[in-house]
Design a protein with these regions (language model features):
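Alpha-helical metal-binding/catalytic segments enriched in His/Glu/Asp
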Residues: 1-18, 104, 220-227
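Generic solvent-exposed, charged/amphipathic alpha-helical segments
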Residues: 8, 12, 122-126, 159
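An extended, acidic, His-containing surface patch that forms the Zn2+-binding/catalytic region
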Residues: 21-99, 107-120, 128, 132-228
């Protein structure tokens, strides 16, 4: 059996038609969004037409039952980051590859244990692998998810500082970016970390042509001064 075809079919079975992750036990520890959190995420400015234009797509795809803002920041993901197999040079070669590999990442949400999730995914991949193939799963690094209460004293002070500096009521949201050390701060140092985002949607974080709006930068300075 062609390894590239086998791997493609295997990975295709990891996501259901409704956009959910097809790994037994994957969602067992996921904490449901509260009504308060859903109201806050609903306040995040959103236009489906503008979002599709920004992404360069004609149609959005995601987990059914959740809005795009909820999917992006509050639901776990299973993503293929890269696929490698067969001839990659110029022109074509009528070969059958001897191997195929994929790089996979999963963004987790509060209460999910990364070591447990890695075990579940590895076990499921091996269980689904066809008998004609030999599969090896190499586990990479992992970090625990982190969330902080938006109603504590420091949170209230931060929100008031943002409102003073920017002249608008702050919008609370969850973010899928990974900063593993903030969970260590909470677990080891017993302190909360508040991530006060100043970037705009088109600032291209960690991407080519990354930028930062000067007005947002300046108002961020005032926000920090107000807070501390």
């Amino acid at each position: 059996e062609n390894p590239a075809m086998a791997l493609s079919k295997l990975l295709g079975r990891m996501i259901n038609k409704n956009g959910s992750i097809n790994v037994p036990g994957f969602y067992d520890d996921v904490v449901k969004l509260t009504a308060y959190e859903r109201r806050q995420l609903a306040r995040v400015p959103y236009s489906e037409a503008k979002y599709k234009k920004l992404l360069g797509v004609k149609l959005l795809f995601g987990e059914k039952g959740f809005t795009p803002n909820e999917q992006r920041g509050a639901r776990p993901t299973f993503e293929i980051n890269g696929l490698t197999s067969g001839y990659q040079g110029e022109g074509s070669k009528t070969i059958v590859p001897s191997f195929a590999s994929a790089k996979i990442t999963m963004r987790l949400v509060p209460n999910q244990n990364p070591k447990k999730i890695l075990r579940l995914v590895a076990r499921h991949l091996k269980a689904l692998s066809p008998p004609t193939m030999r599969i090896e799963v190499e586990l990479g690094h992992a970090a625990d998810p982190y969330i902080v209460s938006p109603t504590g004293p420091l949170a209230k002070a931060a929100l008031e500082s943002l409102k003073t500096a920017f002249g608008h009521e702050p919008v609370l949201l969850r973010e899928g970016g990974s900063i593993p050390i903030v969970e260590h701060f909470a677990r080891i140092l017993k302190v909360d970390t508040y991530l006060l985002g100043l970037a705009l949607p088109d600032d291209n974080l960690h991407s080519p042509n990354e930028k930062m709006d000067l007005e947002a930068f300046t108002r961020g300075i005032w926000m920090s001064a107000n807070l501390w």
